[in-house]
Amino acid sequence: MRINTVFATCSVILAIVSLGSRAVFAGETNVLTETKPPEPRFKISGWIDTGITFNPASPPDNQNFGRFFDDRANEPLLNQLVINFERALAPQPGEFDWGFKLQFMYGSDARYIHSLGLFSDTAATSIVQPDLVEGYFNLHFPIISEDGLDLKLGKFVTLEGVETIDPRANFFYSHTYIFNVGIPFNHTGALATFHATKWLDLYSGITRGVNTSIEDNNDSVSFHGGVGLNLLDGKLTILATTSIGPETPNNNHDQSYFNDIAITAKITDKFTSLTDLNYALNEVSDAQAFGIAQYFTYAINSWLTAGIRGEIFWDDDGFYVFSFANNHDPMRALEGEPTIDPRTVGGGKTTYGAITAGVNIKPPVPKPLAGLAIRPEIRYDCSLNDTRPFNNSSDRDQFTAGIDFIVTF
């Protein structure tokens, strides 16, 4: 009987061990099944952005004065068709890393963001043009600090400003005066980013100048750099940047200054404030401009966000704010050549005010439209000192309503 009892007990123990082993192996199988492979470092992506801006005044020159990327009144625009080839940096602690980015654009926005020497004279008479927006190598060195030093070599977009060339990073379809004329669009050269601490980044670079690349409009280099702060666990960020150097065609001595402070405050999970402070100075013309833009956005739900933006831009010397009526005139002005369209004009000595309100709609739709964003807006611009720069130089103010559609793929 004792032997039978022992055998029975052993049988129960073996059964329990067997079941436990199966459970363990089954658990391991589930873990292995659920483990996802790491995302590839090399990615191809892109987007399409198309929109229209309605101007009830229907100006004879077809221009929304002071506006670059939504400059055509009552005319649909293919703003951007963009494709990216990128290997982003993803450094491991103490290890060297490398990456690169090539971003190609075809669209009406390219007219204004060209750099001299890269597609700046290609399809110059067309409203839609090609451009190489960015083309650079990125190197990470695990030196000096815990997060090390990054070095960017090539052509890259500017550090400056709240708004960007990439429409997906902007709340509104239209841009501020600050973005259009108060900051550079791109640089070509070398830019170092030193991650001094978890909350402090230092930027320093040498470039060929503002919106230049293979060619330059003079023989001097420029400085581009600044300081970035990431505070309150990311709820407050401050980026103070500058670009300093000779930017006037055939002038290697007189300096141009583009200075900007961008402040982002996450007040609540749904409510965000952005502030853009700007100062520009051109020594050749002894001209300066000041700007301030304030944004507030509120996320109503997962797919709908409302926003408002107010701006004042002081162009008291009448040097900075222009409207380019010819598709190639922006590049002619950058090269120092005379513009050819009589309706490429400035607004005179004017202080501009603008207020914009709109929503961002990101409907929950299936692929291939899963990346759809719709940005309707209304905007009111005015001269605050009785000049008449708007609607074919006939009005003190200008009302527009715009909408664009972005599809990311």
Language-model-derived ranges and their functions:
Residues A57-A73, A110-G228, T237-P246, S323, ...:
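Surface-exposed coil loops of outer-membrane beta-barrel proteins
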Residues R67-D70, A110-I113, D121-T125, L236-P246, ...:
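Outer-membrane beta-barrel pore domains
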Residues M1-N30:
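Cleavable N-terminal export/targeting peptides
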